[in-house]
Amino acid sequence: MQVTGSIKFDLKVDDQLLPRARALREQWGASERPVWIAASTHEGEDALILQAHQQLLQAHGDALLILVPRHPERFDAVHALCCGQFATVRRSAGAAVDGQTRVLLGDTMGELLFLYALADIAFVGGSLVATGGHNPLEPAALALPVIMGPHVFNFLEISAMLRDAGALQQVDDAQGLAEAVRQLIELPQDARRMGEAGRAVMQANQGALQRLLDGLARLIR
């Protein structure tokens, strides 16, 4: 028997992803704006995230939130929720973010890594509600500081590794989320340190897929 490790660490990031994201932020005129993403969110969580964004805007009035619901059937309802409070652009509509936009709704499929790449700070959803959280290695692979709520039971070991390395911070509620994002905006050296720690965890644990393939090759010889 051989333990190969988790293939989740073997996430490959396209070399053009970050340059494409930087170019789009420049096109938006948002290179200097604080941008944070709340990704893979669930019902009951979006309202908490928008509450956190409202609090954040009191300190950083130009902050942009990229909100990405986990399930496509919720896109319209979450869009309505956003529009009730903020100037909102739907990614699927192809409209550009401008200086008045406060929320970009990530309502497209297959773009999650690119949407992460547009951000400076990442909140991974399914964790402020008792869903168990989603994969924090996706933002870690892009050297983003990662925030999650208290419910991470789907990724207990991985979240513990990132937390112990100083790459992931957990918060309990909307107020804690707003405060965590605010601090990372105001202390960019801390944000960089968290991001670099996450990428180091990724790199230190890569190779499981190749070990698995090598093991399978030996078995079928």
Regions found by a protein language model. Give the residues of each.
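Nucleotide-activated sugar donor-binding and catalytic core shared by glycosyltransferases
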Residues: 1-221
